[in-house]
């Protein structure tokens, strides 16, 4: 049964119990390794195939695809995953002016060009670089992504520099 059919069944009451989907909402494309200052040792296609195999083995049904300030690789991964029954919510990771990292995900049908335009609306300090933060505070960024129709959440929030650790200290 396709995701759309399953979801339709959930909202129309065809199912008498809740239907849950196994999700991985912060999946990185092959180019993400560059953010860490490293070089990829396999091709993008090999990376995507390995990612797909790991996702299928884990029973993942939905992924959120996010790279730091970039949407490169979205289309290739989305096409491959959709062909294999996995829903892809494309997006990106971005840091607020306080350097809090957020994952921003959008409608599964958003094109990489539309995502690029959204990135352009988020006041990045250096749009061509994609790594530097936005001028927007966390609250402003959350509001703006919500206004655009996206879903935003704190990335790696339990790390030492994550938003939860900052809040508790």
Where are these regions (language model features)?
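Divalent metal-dependent hydrolysis catalytic cores, especially in the metallo-beta-lactamase
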Residues: 51-68, 151-153
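Extended substrate/RNA-proximal surfaces in nucleic-acid metabolism proteins
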Residues: 2-14, 20, 69, 75-169
């Amino acid at each position: 049964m396709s995701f759309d059919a399953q979801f339709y069944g959930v909202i129309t009451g065809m199912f008498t119990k809740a239907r849950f989907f196994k999700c991985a909402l912060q999946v990185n494309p092959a180019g993400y390794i560059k953010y860490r200052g490293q070089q990829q040792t396999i091709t993008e296609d090999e990376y995507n195939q390995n990612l797909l195999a790991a996702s299928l083995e884990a029973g993942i049904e939905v992924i959120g695809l996010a790279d730091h300030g970039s949407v490169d690789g979205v289309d290739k991964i989305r096409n491959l995953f959709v062909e294999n029954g996995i829903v892809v919510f494309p997006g990106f990771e971005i840091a607020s002016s306080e350097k809090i990292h957020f994952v921003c995900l959008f409608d599964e049908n958003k094109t990489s060009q539309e995502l690029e335009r959204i990135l352009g609306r988020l006041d990045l300090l250096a749009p061509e670089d994609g790594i530097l933060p936005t001028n927007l505070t966390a609250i402003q960024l959350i509001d703006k992504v919500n206004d655009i129709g996206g879903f935003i959440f704190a990335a790696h929030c339990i790390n030492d520099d994550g938003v939860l650790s900052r809040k508790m200290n």
